[in-house]
């Protein structure tokens, strides 16, 4: 009984940053040959797979989104900089992951559609970049690997999520 409760507690703790009614699907490799094709072929996920998921499974899928990550990105404002990962996300990312916007807003549908160069940064990142100059981050432009992004939101998670992530529109990161 004690071990069972421990496992349940560990699962609840590890999933506290994620909606319990969500799943993640990752690309991979085939394990069996099929129709004359060899095993070990790479399975790629494309944008139309996301659209098809919502279209063909409306009774089971409330919403679908995708993420893409670009790691080790230097983000700077003036002389200050941090090294973070840019996460390209859909607006519904906050329905699945517990990212709480403390100031400003999160990525929205217009940002995604228009491939806007907007960014949502962690409060710790904002403190590093803007703290010395006492500049209000919302509306300012930061440089991320030579691309200027306008800060539209600040998030402040208390969970295990790293402060080393910033969020931009999925479509924007795909085009860079």
What are the roles of these predicted feature ranges?
Residues 5-85, 92-95, 127-128, 175:
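Hydrophobic, regular-secondary-structure patches
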Residues 87, 92-107, 111, 115-176:
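Mid-to-C-terminal secondary-structure elements
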Residues 1-3:
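A hydrophobic alpha-helix feature that marks transmembrane segments and, especially
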